[in-house]
Amino acid sequence: MTAITNIAAREILDSRGNPTVEVDVLLEDGSFGRAAVPSGASTGAHEAVELRDGDKSRYNGKGVLKAVDAVQSEILDAIGGMDAEDQVAVDEAMIALDGTPNKARLGANAILGVSLAVAKAAAETAGLPLYRYVGGVQGRVLPVPMMNIVNGGAHADNPIDFQEFMVMPVGATSLSDAVRMGAEIFHTLKSALKKAGHNTNVGDEGGFAPNLPSAEAALDFVMESINAAGFKPGSDVVLALDCAATEFFKDGAYRYEGEGQTRSIEQQVDYLAKLTEAYPILSIEDGMSEDDWDGWKLLTDRIGSRVQLVGDDLFVTNVERLARGIETGTANSILVKVNQIGSLTETLAAVDMAQRAGYTAVMSHRSGETEDSTIADLAVATNCGQIKTGSLARSDRLAKYNQLIRIEEGLGAQALYAGRSAIRQLAGR
C-alpha cells in the first residue's frame, strides 16, 4: 500500500528567481507528497553539492535540469517499489546510488527533494501531519523564532559585514504571541529607519538592509525598536547574530571591508565578547570561520558558558564535523539545514547527535527559499526549540511562520512554547 509507484520532478524558481528542484512522490494507495528544495547564498565549503547545469545559455548556468533528470531516471529506478514508510532505507538507497561523499553525482538537491517528498507521502498515508509522523507523540515543542530584521553581508547590498541581526521573543507566551511580538518590532524598526533617513528595502530574508556603518549601529537601531515597541531587551526579547565570518576571513584574518577594519583571530574573539557585554546577545552563529577551529575553541572557552555559539558553516549539518566539535568542546549548538546534508535521515541524525551531547539545535531556512514549509514541521518534530526562518516580510519566510501557527493550533493544549528554556545559557539565569 505504501510502495513508491511514481516520482516526478520539475524546475521551479526560488525566492531569488533562481531555479530549484521540486519533487512529487506518488504511492500505491494514492497518497502524494511534494517538496521543494532551498538554496543558500553564503554556503559552507563542506556542504553537500547542489547540482547545477552550468549551461550559461539558461538561467546564467544555474539551471537544475540535470538534477531533475536524475530524479526521474536513476533515482526512480532505484527506489521505485520501495516502502515509503522505511525512510532510512529509501535515503540510504539514494546515498549509495550517488556513490560520492558529498552527493556530487546526483546532487543533494535531487536526493533531498525525493527524501522530503517521500516523508510527506508516507505521512499522508498514515493520516498524520508531517510533524507528528516524523516526531511521534513527543513532537509538541513550538520553537522560539530567530527573526532576522536587519540584513548585511552576502544577504544585502550595504556596508554591514555581519549577515544577520535577529530578535528572539523568549518572553512570549506562545508561538503565535512570539510572531506578534516580532511583527511589532519589525514595523517599529521600519518607522525608526525611515525617520532617520534610511531606506527600508529588504534583503534576501526579508530583513531591512539600511546603509549603516557598523554592527553597533545596526544593534542600536534594533535595541531602540524593541524598546519603542513596548518590550524589554534581555527579558522579553534577546538578540542573536549571524556573523557569517567565513565570508570575510581572508589570509588568516577577519577583514571587515564595510567597516574598513582588519581583526586577528584573537581580536575577533575579543570583539564578539565585547558585543555580548554591551548588548543582550544570547546567540552568535558562525562568529569564526568554518575551518578556524582554533579560533572557534578560543571563542567557546571565552563566552560559551553565557552565549549560545551556533556552528553553521562549521558543522554543515554533518555528523562527522559535529562529532569533532563535540569531542573538542567547540561551539555548543548546531544550525540544521536540510540541504546542507541532503536527506531527512541524515538531518535527523545530526539533531539527535547534538541533543545527546547537550548541544542545542536550530532548524533553519536558506536565503533562497520557496513556499515549502517542511522545516516548520521538522522544528516541532525534533523538539529543537529554535527556528531561523527570516523576517516578517516575504511570503517565502511567512509560509513557515504561518505553518507553525497552524501546528500550534492543531496541538491545542498539548502545545508547549520553548521560550526561555530554548537557550540553555538563558534558562539558567
Curated annotation (Swiss-Prot):
Cofactor(s) needed: Mg(2+)
Ranges annotated as spanning the membrane: none
A GO term from the CC aspect: cell surface
Free-text function comment from the UniProt entry: Catalyzes the reversible conversion of 2-phosphoglycerate (2-PG) into phosphoenolpyruvate (PEP). It is essential for the degradation of carbohydrates via glycolysis.
Top EC category: lyase
Family named by the database record: Belongs to the enolase family.
Name of protein: Enolase
Cofactor-binding details, from the entry: Binds a second Mg(2+) ion via substrate during catalysis.
Gene coding for it: eno
Source species of the chain: Methylorubrum extorquens (strain CM4 / NCIMB 13688) (Methylobacterium extorquens)
Disulfide bonds: none
Compartments where found: Cytoplasm; Secreted; Cell surface
Pathway given in the UniProt record: Carbohydrate degradation; glycolysis; pyruvate from D-glyceraldehyde 3-phosphate: step 4/5
InterPro entries for the chain: Enolase, Enolase-like_C_sf, Enolase-like_N, Enolase_C, Enolase_CS, Enolase_N
One GO process term, biological-process aspect: glycolytic process
